[in-house]
């Protein structure tokens, strides 16, 4: 297994392509706000909180129910994920 630890910073509402991770992913909010429906319902997370995205869970893309934070909201996250040797940690769905 390979381990990926990445720090991201973004401003404005989420805008990412639909995707999944072959191995589970941990998302930790360093600062700002984020939202996830990994638990089955949308929840908002802020500084010091985290959520787990299960393996093969398809998410991202357009979801009209996703909470909106506005263009002036910036978020910094630490994302920890693993991948089997030779596999990408994120698979985008076309």
Predicted regions and their residues:
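Short acidic-glycine-tyrosine-enriched beta hairpin
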Residues: 10, 33, 38-58
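A short glycine-rich, His/Asp/Glu-containing loop-to-beta-strand
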Residues: 1-18, 80-83
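Extracellular/periplasmic catalytic domains that process cell-envelope and extracellular macromolecules
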Residues: 20, 28, 43-44, 69-74
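Membrane-topology and secretion signals of cell-surface/extracellular proteins
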Residues: 4, 15-16, 37, 55-58, ...
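Short, conserved beta-strand element in jelly-roll/cupin
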Residues: 9-11, 21-36
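Double-stranded beta-helix
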Residues: 62-94
């Amino acid at each position: 297994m390979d381990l990926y630890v990445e720090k991201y910073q973004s401003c404005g509402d989420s805008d990412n392509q639909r995707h999944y991770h072959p191995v589970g992913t941990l998302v930790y909010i360093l600062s700002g706000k984020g939202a996830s429906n990994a638990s089955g319902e949308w929840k908002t997370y802020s500084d010091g909180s985290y959520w787990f995205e299960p393996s093969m869970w398809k998410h991202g893309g357009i979801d009209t129910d996703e909470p909106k934070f506005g263009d002036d909201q910036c978020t910094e996250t630490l994302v920890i994920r693993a991948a089997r040797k030779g596999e990408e940690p994120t698979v985008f769905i076309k």
